[in-house]
Amino acid sequence: MSDADRLITPEKRGEDIDTTLRPQSLDDFTGQAEARANLKVFIEAAKNRGEALDHVLFVGPPGLGKTTLAQIMAKELGVNFKSTSGPVIAKAGDLAALLTNLEERDVLFIDEIHRLNPAVEEILYPAMEDFQLDLIIGEGPAARSVKIDLSKFTLVAATTRLGLLTTPLRDRFGIPVRLAFYTVDELELIVRRGARLMGLNMTDGGAREIARRARGTPRIAGRLLRRVRDFAEVARAEAVTREIADEALTRLLVDNMGLDQLDMRYLTMIAVNFGGGPVGIETIAAGLSEPRDAIEDIIEPYMIQQGFIQRTPRGRILTATAWKHLGLQPPKDLEAAQFRLTLEDD
């Protein structure tokens, strides 16, 4: 099973694009309290000065609301919102077309900016810093440089991998914002709101059960809510109770920690095949037949946040929490081995 086929992948799928469930303001947005509070200040200050907001960089795992926050920012600034992604901007001309069509103080959102073509990135530097495009027209001896003035705009970019951004690009963002996984309480509020907008009767236990298995990710919470609704409707249930949510998600092979078959294969392979580790990421990728990027960006962030694995210079190792979840007996010297690897990491 590839990551794209998983119910709990945080990557965007067509069914996730339901604008009616998205919050429309920062006050309506649940979670990320510190980031929201700071963004409110920056937005209000920019509006009071009548200036474009400084460029913003959102950093964090997929599905935490980076696109939604960018849309809300444009709405609260009272400006137009245009959206694209790094892989889509293949040539300098593609970027030039986007930038020259922006009006004063507009917001341009670029998702996956770490996947931007290096040649395009070079064009972006003067656009962000001086609001100018410096293009080369023609070829050979007839080539000439043309400068095009741009409207003062705000670039809002998102990345799941800050380390892949070049230093010159990273330094041009005046407002870096790191987004964290959501708590179960925050996700419960999100599930309740989604159920209310769907006209779905939801008990406290039902909302809590869905939130517990959503891997700290609102996008996954919304997807699980829709699937649980299907089970509840077919069962002609008057409300989504904890029992109905538990039965539905168990049948969908999402366990009580939000792990699915691929997650369990990941943990089991390290435990059984490699004695709990350490094992390198390339070996894990080969064993799972999954791309390295998918493992590092999709599977491991939640595993680390939940304390299932540790990353060390020698590879991944399972923690006592992971062994307990698998129902397997950990090695007798597990704590000592982990301590030694931690010292090596330092």
Curated annotation (Swiss-Prot):
Note down the stretches annotated as region Large ATPase domain (RuvB-L). 1-182
- Quote the record's binding site residues for Mg(2+): 67
- Residues bound to DNA are 292, 311, 316
Recorded catalytic reaction(s): these are: ATP + H2O = ADP + phosphate + H(+)
Q: Could you tell me which InterPro entries the record lists for this protein?
A: AAA+_ATPase, AAA_lid_4, CbxX/CfxQ, DNA_helicase_Holl-junc_RuvB, P-loop_NTPase, RuvB-like_N, RuvB_C, WH-like_DNA-bd_sf
Name the domain of life this protein comes from. Bacteria
GO terms under cellular component: cytoplasm; Holliday junction resolvase complex
Q: Where is this region: Head domain (RuvB-H)?
A: 256-346
User: Which intervals of the chain are annotated as region Small ATPAse domain (RuvB-S)?
Assistant: 183-253
Q: Where in the cell is it found?
A: Cytoplasm
- In residue numbers, the region (Disordered) covers 1-23
The signal peptide annotation in the UniProt record is none
Q: Keyword Membrane, does the record have it? A: no
Q: What UniProt keywords apply to this chain's record, in alphabetical order?
A: ATP-binding, Cytoplasm, DNA damage, DNA recombination, DNA repair, DNA-binding, Hydrolase, Nucleotide-binding
Q: Which SUPFAM superfamilies match?
A: P-loop containing nucleoside triphosphate hydrolases, Winged helix' DNA-binding domain
Give EC number(s), comma-separated. Answer: 3.6.4.-
Q: Which residues bind ATP?
A: 21-22, 63, 66-68, 129-131, 172, 182, 219
What family is reported?
Answer: Belongs to the RuvB family.
What UniProt notes about the protein's domains is: Has 3 domains, the large (RuvB-L) and small ATPase (RuvB-S) domains and the C-terminal head (RuvB-H) domain. The head domain binds DNA, while the ATPase domains jointly bind ATP, ADP or are empty depending on the state of the subunit in the translocation cycle. During a single DNA translocation step the structure of each domain remains the same, but their relative positions change.
Question: Subunit comment for this entry?
Answer: Homohexamer. Forms an RuvA(8)-RuvB(12)-Holliday junction (HJ) complex. HJ DNA is sandwiched between 2 RuvA tetramers; dsDNA enters through RuvA and exits via RuvB. An RuvB hexamer assembles on each DNA strand where it exits the tetramer. Each RuvB hexamer is contacted by two RuvA subunits (via domain III) on 2 adjacent RuvB subunits; this complex drives branch migration. In the full resolvosome a probable DNA-RuvA(4)-RuvB(12)-RuvC(2) complex forms which resolves the HJ.
- Known role: The RuvA-RuvB-RuvC complex processes Holliday junction (HJ) DNA during genetic recombination and DNA repair, while the RuvA-RuvB complex plays an important role in the rescue of blocked DNA replication forks via replication fork reversal (RFR). RuvA specifically binds to HJ cruciform DNA, conferring on it an open structure. The RuvB hexamer acts as an ATP-dependent pump, pulling dsDNA into and through the RuvAB complex. RuvB forms 2 homohexamers on either side of HJ DNA bound by 1 or 2 RuvA tetramers; 4 subunits per hexamer contact DNA at a time.
Q: Which HAMAP family match?
A: DNA_HJ_migration_RuvB
Know the name of this protein?
Answer: Holliday junction branch migration complex subunit RuvB
In which organism is this protein found? Agrobacterium fabrum (strain C58 / ATCC 33970) (Agrobacterium tumefaciens (strain C58))
